[in-house]
């Protein structure tokens, strides 16, 4: 009798009670498991709204958290995953299953790598940002624009190093940016290693919290990320970043306030 194939990768969705119906994983596959973490502080009845496309599947597990915070939600998924690999997800992401399999193959070939920071397209089929032309080591510099749905992690490695999302950052927190970059930075600073490459694993619409620039709140939120990652070196790093991105920060004055963390 042939042994059943064990799932190798979990898609870990973070969503809210009023949006959980939007979750749309790839078709069922023996290698795939799905976890959906539902933020539901109001304790509303979201289960009755689930479409058959979710309820009829045998590979989906739901968890509920009675609190806001996407980082909390992603940590719940990280704790619950039972597969070697985990790819984080939002409820408006469409995944490319062949691309995910390509990402698994890259990590299989490099067992010392704790994660792959992959690539994504927008709804028009365009790459969402500049990605390296080939697979390169993950660094503090090239992981600065990390998006959660690009992060394919080796679960035992990140758990062994105690890497989690900092719940003071990310959507639903006052510091609503930076949770992904901080995760990557913490992995690297803990002695871990990662890969970054042009393997397209997802499609995500162009508009997101990571694409907002120019407001005072945005500038301050970005400044705090540098404090968290670079500590006492943060002002110097912010200065270099601010000079490069002064237009997005609101001109020279905005870049100066950013450098000072204001």
Describe the predicted segments one by one:
Residues 97-131:
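Conserved donor NDP-sugar-binding/catalytic core segment of glycosyltransferases
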Residues 1-33:
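N-proximal low-complexity "stem/linker" segments adjacent to membrane-targeting elements
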Residues 86:
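Short aromatic/hydrophobic "clamp" motif used to bind/position activated sugar donors
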Residues 171-175, 192-213, 222-225:
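Active-site donor/metal-binding and catalytic loop motifs
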Residues 151, 157-161, 168-197:
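A short, conserved alpha-helix in the catalytic core of glycosyltransferases
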Residues 23-64:
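Acidic donor-binding segment of Leloir-type glycosyltransferases
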Residues 64-81:
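Glycine-rich, basic loop-to-helix element that forms the pyrophosphate-binding segment
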Residues 213-262:
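Non-catalytic, C-terminal membrane-associated alpha-helical segments of glycosyltransferases
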